Design a protein with these regions (language model features):
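A general structural signal for well-ordered alpha-helical segments in protein cores
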Residues: 1-2, 115-120, 148
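Short hydrophobic/aromatic-rich beta-strand segments that constitute the beta-sheet cores
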Residues: 17, 47, 71, 78-80, ...
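Short, solvent-exposed polar/charged micro-motifs at secondary-structure junctions
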Residues: 24-29, 57, 145-147, 171-176
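A short beta-strand motif that forms part of the nucleic acid-binding face
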Residues: 49-51, 64, 75, 167
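A contiguous, mid-protein "functional segment" used to position or interact
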Residues: 134-168
Length: 187
């Protein structure tokens, strides 16, 4: 999911993450992720993922100054409103009472599991030696890995981190985590 996020919004410059490793499992795995990302443009983003809920809801919400997009299952809800920045500056109270907006819902057919499609296209590209089959170039994956590494580092150290992350510090952290895991009692 981070790869789709990064593909849509680009790389943040900073992030802070909370990851309770092993919350739902007896081993160190990222069962939940809460990541707050910051961009030099002033944009912020929240990324929340959990494997510990039965509802299996996939949802992406994008809120800007002119619209809100909400993607849930096979429905895209678009709420277009007057410019929020102007509304905030001119409205007497913090209320949406006088905010003018329109709403639209777009339903589409539910497609196959996205990762299945990505793997199929990767296999086609590999077999045909044709990058044109790919959804995105392989180098794009490095950005997702940097986000993941930054989130792990932030969560383990309890600090906000700048991106790109220092590879030497990240390797030291991973080496320590691997050693700790080797010495952890078996459950």
């Amino acid at each position: 999911i981070l790869d789709i996020f990064q593909y849509l919004f680009g790389m943040p410059q900073r992030l802070f993450a909370v990851i309770p490793f092993g919350k739902y499992n007896p081993f160190a795995v990222d069962d939940e992720d809460t990541i707050v990302m910051e961009y030099d443009t002033g944009m912020t983003a929240s990324f929340i993922l959990t494997t510990g809920e039965a509802c299996c809801e996939e949802r992406m919400e994008i809120i800007g100054t002119k619209a809100r997009l909400l993607l849930e299952d096979n429905t895209l809800s678009i709420t277009r409103f007057d410019d929020i920045e102007k509304y905030i500056k001119t409205e007497d109270v913090n209320s949406r009472e006088h905010l003018h907006f329109t709403e639209e819902k777009i339903m589409y057919e539910k497609s196959a599991e996205p990762y299945t499609q990505l793997l199929e296209k990767f296999a086609q590209a590999s077999l045909k030696h044709d990058e044109g089959c790919l959804v995105a170039k392989g180098a794009e994956g490095l950005h997702s890995l940097m986000l993941c590494a930054g989130a792990y580092y932030s969560a383990c150290k309890g600090i906000r981190v700048d991106l790109p992350l220092d590879a030497v510090r990240y390797k030291e952290l991973m080496d320590n985590l691997i050693e700790d895991e080797k010495n952890a009692p078996v459950m």
